[in-house]
Structures are given as C-alpha cells and as structure tokens.
C-alpha cells in the first residue's frame, strides 16, 4: 500500500530547515489535535498520528537523510534502519509544552546538545576507526553533586511555584503554563550557593572521549553520543554530543557512494601490445592485465576493494580508468621511427578513425 510523502503531509518543501518544520508541525498539531476537534474524532486522531510520524522523521537529521535517500524503505528497515519504528506522543513534550502548556521540569533543566566537527581521511572512512577527541563542556559539579548548594546546606522548594518549576496563567479560555521566574524554572531555591560552581551546579571542563567511527561514513554523516553534551541543571538530563563527519579529499581516488574511481596512465606500447599495469587500492598496489589494443577510457573493475557499505555491509569496487599518455619531448630519431610506424599502418589498424571519417565524408557530400 502506498504511503503519503512526509513533506506533503506537513505541507513543506524538501529543502525546508528544521525551524520551519517545527513551525509547520505546531500549526498542524493545533489544527488537528483530537482534543480540539469536535466532529469525527476518529479521523482527527488518524490525521494527527500521520502528522506526528512525519514530524518524527523530518525533525531527526539521520532519519530525514535516510528518508530522502531511500523513501519510506529507508525508515522501515529495508535500508539498514531499525525495523518497526514506533511513534509516541511522549516524544513531543517540548512542542506541546509550548502549545498547550506543561512540559516537565526535568526537560526544562536538560543540558544543551553539542556539536564537534571531525575530519578523517578516506581510508578511515572506508574501513572504520576509533578516534579520541577533546571537548570543552559543562560537567556536573563534584563539590555539590550538581545541586548548586554549599555542602552541608539544603536546597529549598520554591514557594512561588511549589516546586513545579512552572506557574499557570489564565489567558482567555486557555490556562497557559510558563517557567517560574522566582526559581528560573528549577522548582528550587538555594540559600547558600556552592563556592565551586557559584550555584550553577555545573563547572566548565575539558573531557576526552573515544569515538567509534563505523566503516562507510561520508561527509555529512553524524554520530550521536547520548548524554555527552552539556550537563543538566540541578539533576536535569545531560544533552547529547553530535560528531559531524568531514572526509578529506584524496589525492588519487574520487568517491561515488561505495565505489572508488581513479585514472591510471598507460604508455603507447602497453596500450598497443598489452601488459601488466600497477594500480592502487586503499590497502596496497595490485597488477591488472591490460589486453592488446586497449583504448583510452577503458574501465577495469577491482571488486570489493572499495568502501564498506554503511547500511548493509559488503564493499564497493575500485574502478580504474586507463588514460593513454601521449609521449612528449621526442628526439628526431624517435619522431622518424614513429612516422615510419604510422606510414606502415593501414585502415584495418584504425577502425574507429575510418568509421568516423567515413561518416564525416558522407555528411558533407
């Protein structure tokens, strides 16, 4: 059964940024939320779930990339994605906190996500590697264990919001919740602040992490390290670290998906008579047999010598394109010998030239 395009469901273009995707989702969620639709709630619930699913995919960079490349198959397990993707309304707490009020205190205290740009070479991208990175980030304060309070003192519940971290404001027919100004949304009041973190609950540090790079990554891929972002405020969850991959340009190979292309020069004699030619791979050098009469542009394929497929294992190929190198700086003797050789050749030695000039002659007649 055919499935609707996610971009069509949200009414957005394929190049829409994340901010506009969220905006479109909010607008549609307000319109089709079952609690706001009086008639045909069953249809409204179906429509709302469809909108939820579209937003869950398009708001996630990795899922969106898989969907853009493979369509619905990319997020249904056919292209290496996890099979049976589930969609729960609990994943939309931040947005519904904005629309209908609410949102957990723990969510408000969550640490920020971080990004680290990592440059690797083509061989590391092809075969996978593990690298160590050093990042500056906020870590939970060891002195106060993240409470922000001076050791030996206690953290008090905010009297304004009763520890909820939010206050409710009536706006017309709607009751809207907003972060409490008295405690900055934490639900707590500190009487004596920690001398180490000055009441923040976090301190700035440098942290070294080992990042496993899977074989087959390419520029634009990113790796998520859960909980390795900024520390949460006063018991809040830590954010995530996103490692953005950049693959350096190679001196010999040009990458196309999982295949590697290179151009291999061969001399005139080898092209005419045939012979062995040494060609590169990412690991070593190999010899290929060039048959007599090889023309420039002929492709030779070295199977499974390319890049590991990121999604389903196996490897691509190395494809060598031979290029006939015309000799230069010839001596007078060499030129004479070459001219004699040319004079000795007949039409049967140059079938493509004869065919071309024959067609050209008939064209002008």
Curated annotation (Swiss-Prot):
GO terms for molecular function: ATP binding; heat shock protein binding; unfolded protein binding; zinc ion binding. It is found in: Cytoplasm. It comes from Vesicomyosocius okutanii subsp. Calyptogena okutanii (strain HA). Zn(2+) 1 binds at residues 141, 144, 194, 197. A zinc finger (CR-type) spans 128-206. It holds the Pfam family DnaJ. CXXCXGXG motif repeats lie at residues 141-148, 158-165, 180-187, 194-201. Belongs to the DnaJ family. This is Chaperone protein DnaJ. Residues 5-71 form the J domain.
